[in-house]
Regions:
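TPR/TPR-like (Sel1-like) alpha-helical repeat modules
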Residues: 332, 361-384
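Short coil/turn linkers that connect adjacent helices within long alpha-helical scaffolds
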Residues: 6-8, 46-50, 88-92, 130-134, ...
Length: 387
């Protein structure tokens, strides 16, 4: 037991430590934030007991930090524990439950577990709508998060509708410089990019960049995201030199923030590789693709969708250079991962089969090409029938 005076001291210490945790997290100082979050958990357990909501708050903070650091298993475990404590103390409909559900869903998204994430995002959104109403900023954030998931699942019309809802709410609340509206603008730009509407996408990306720069400062991870997305448009438009310049800015910010072996760096290496391929610098492209694959394998693991993307990209490079044996190895490895993660009847599996079929056709391996092409068509027919 602690005395009343000790309790007051610990109470102030927990408040201060939690504040510093959040401040460091927002500034992208994740190692410092993690140590402070661990300390706040210890303080909360000592003064309030292991089942206190303040323990849950501290656990939730640490889970968010671990998520951005790529420590997904630890993040998931902490988030589940925090959710259990909150539900036991506050009941299933409290707004704090919505926050924890949202964070756990975000961890599942980071791990590529999209099916597990959707019901959590939906439950979180329902709680927010009930607690705050449909035009509240918290509800807008809920729309944005669910839209992010739909975008990743290629459910673009549903995603666009939710992004526009979120932006409307932010603007109604005169919150046009809030980082969250930057997120919604950035993600709506992704939809325009996918549809080939590059001018519209670039305008939205630049708006997001300006908002984040004011709200977060020039070296914040969100700035790296904005620069990365602007670079992506330049790449798609064939402006490879400008794209490479911006991607290297992204790499500099992310290496400073996360270290050299973070999964965000894997994506940037992949993007630089694509630029190098566009410039005809094939040896450099191969080197950067391999770097992306190695980092992804060591951080996200081989069952993550990004890993398949990197495998397919290096396979495409080998196919273009008529190094068919190496291309086949990476295409097949990507196909096996997709079948394991999504099942054998997923459209992404069909696309991977078509990549192999196209390569076999160019080699004159007509029977192999026909076999994979027919399998892909069968999957697409089933998908259309079930949609």
């Amino acid at each position: 037991m602690v005395s009343n005076n000790e309790e007051k001291v610990y109470d102030a210490l927990w408040d201060n430590t939690t504040y510093k945790t959040i401040t460091n997290y927002r500034e992208g100082k994740y190692n410092e934030a993690a140590e402070l979050a661990k300390l706040s958990i210890d303080i909360a357990k000592k003064i309030y007991g292991k089942d206190s909501t303040k323990v849950a708050i501290s656990m939730n903070n640490l889970s968010l930090i671990y998520d951005v650091q790529g420590k997904f298993a630890e993040a998931e475990s902490l988030s589940i524990n925090a959710l259990e404590i909150w539900e036991n103390n506050l009941g299933p409909e409290d707004p704090e439950i919505a926050t924890c559900l949202n964070n756990l869903a975000g961890i599942y998204v980071s791990r590529g577990k999209y099916k597990e994430a959707e019901p959590l995002y939906k439950r979180s959104l329902e709680i927010k709508e009930k607690a705050f109403g449909q035009n509240h900023l918290e509800t807008a954030t809920g729309y944005n998060n669910l839209a992010d998931l739909y975008r990743l699942e290629k459910r673009f019309n549903e995603a666009e509708s939710l992004y526009r809802k979120a932006i409307d709410i932010f603007e109604q609340n005169k919150n046009v410089k809030d980082p969250n509206i930057g997120s919604s603008l950035n993600n709506l730009a992704e939809i325009h990019k996918i549809k080939g509407q590059y001018d519209d996408a670039l305008k939205l990306y630049k708006r997001a960049f300006e908002i984040w720069k004011i709200a977060c400062g020039p070296d914040h991870p969100d700035i790296a995201t904005a620069i990365n997305n602007i670079a992506g448009i330049y790449y798609l438009e064939g402006n490879y030199e400008e794209a490479e310049k911006l991607y290297r800015e992204v790499l500099k910010i992310d290496e400073k923030t996360y270290g050299v072996n973070h999964h965000y760096n894997a994506m940037t290496f992949n993007n630089i590789a694509l630029v190098k391929e566009g410039l005809g610098q094939y040896d450099d492209a191969e080197r950067y693709f391999k770097e992306a694959i190695n980092i992804c394998q060591n951080t996200l693991g081989e069952n993550h969708p990004s890993f398949v993307t990197f495998l397919n990209n290096v396979a495409g490079l080998y196919r273009a250079r008529e190094r068919y044996e190496e291309a086949e190895f990476y295409f097949k490895k990507g196909l096996l991962v997709l079948e394991k993660v999504f099942g054998s009847n997923n459209p992404d599996v069909a696309m991977a089969m078509l990549n192999l079929a196209e390569m076999y056709e160019s080699q004159g391996r007509t029977e192999d090409a026909k076999r994979f092409s027919e399998s892909a068509k069968s999957i697409y027919k089933k998908a259309l029938k079930n949609s």
